[in-house]
Swiss-Prot record:
Coiled coil start-end: none
Keywords: Developmental protein, DNA-binding, Homeobox, Nucleus, Transcription, Transcription regulation
GO molecular function: DNA-binding transcription factor activity, RNA polymerase II-specific; RNA polymerase II cis-regulatory region sequence-specific DNA binding
Lineage of producing organism: Eukaryota, Metazoa, Chordata, Craniata, Vertebrata
Span list, region Disordered: 75-175
Origin superkingdom: Eukaryota
Protein name per UniProt: Homeobox protein Hox-A5
Length: 270
């Protein structure tokens, strides 16, 4: 049964027996054992796959797909880099075989191999772009650090110049000597910081009561002054000052009256 399939495939694909299987080991010791690929793969894989490239000489549809997929697999296999220890010397006289794929790329179907080849190329391109991005980022970081160092240099120079310059001394307060102080300030400090007492505004009732008391007695005793101060809600000092002012006014009035009377008496003298 196996010889039937082998003979049929050998007739259809004349360059099939020249292709060899990837061998993982010392190729010098094992190459003779797997020389004939048709006899090796006929019993293991059946008629579906026998280690040869099914895309060679196939015009129409095959067992595993169309010719375009086979061509893409052949192109991906030739584009993929091959490691030297997995390569085998080709003995075909018709056309050179494609470079064998690494272990991760070997699969039973050509579609899977083309997919892996696309993934490898994408991985290489993404790795290159990542390396370019990292170099770009590192260059930008280098520029940023350089600019930061340039900015720090003027700041440090400004700080050094500020430290070297003497800071302005606070304005000194004027010195006050004892003879400049005000000594004759009232103990009540009613008039404020100047020491001038505000003028007392007496009510009409207080003025009337003080006028009555002055009419009866122009000089008050201490006892009577205390009584009037409690009655009018005033201090003793206010009562004393009011009586002093009232006496001065009374004396002035009396002096003017006496002078007028004297002048009038001399004028009428015969």
């Amino acid at each position: 049964m196996s010889s039937y399939f082998v003979n049929s495939f050998c007739g259809r694909y004349p360059n099939g027996p020249d292709y060899q299987l990837h061998n993982y080991g010392d190729h010098s010791s094992v190459s003779e054992q797997f020389r004939d690929s048709a006899s090796m793969h006929s019993g293991r894989y059946g008629y579906g796959y026998n280690g040869m490239d099914l895309s060679v000489g196939r015009s129409g549809s095959g067992h595993f797909g169309s010719g375009e997929r086979a061509r893409s697999y052949a192109a991906g296999a030739s584009a993929a880099p091959a490691e030297p220890r997995y390569s085998q010397p080709a003995t075909s006289t018709h056309s050179p075989p494609p470079d064998p794929l690494p272990c991760s790329a070997v699969a039973p179907s050509p579609g899977g191999d083309s997919h892996h080849g696309g993934k490898n190329s994408l991985g290489n391109s993404s790795g290159a772009s990542a390396n370019a991005g990292s170099t770009h980022i590192s260059s930008r970081e280098g520029v940023g650090t350089a600019s930061g160092a340039e900015e720090d240099a003027p700041a440090s120079s400004e700080q050094a110049s500020a430290q070297s310059e003497p800071s302005p001394a606070p304005p000194a307060q004027p010195q006050i000597y004892p003879w400049m102080r005000k000594l004759h300030i009232s103990h009540d400090n009613i008039g404020g910081p100047e020491g001038k007492r505000a003028r007392t505004a007496y009510t009409r009732y207080q003025t009337l009561e003080l006028e009555k008391e002055f009419h009866f007695n122009r000089y008050l005793t201490r006892r009577r002054r205390i009584e009037i101060a409690h009655a009018l809600c005033l201090s003793e000092r206010q009562i004393k000052i009011w009586f002093q002012n009232r006496r001065m006014k009374w004396k002035k009035d009396n002096k003017l009256k006496s002078m007028s009377m004297a002048a009038a008496g001399g004028a009428f003298r015969p």
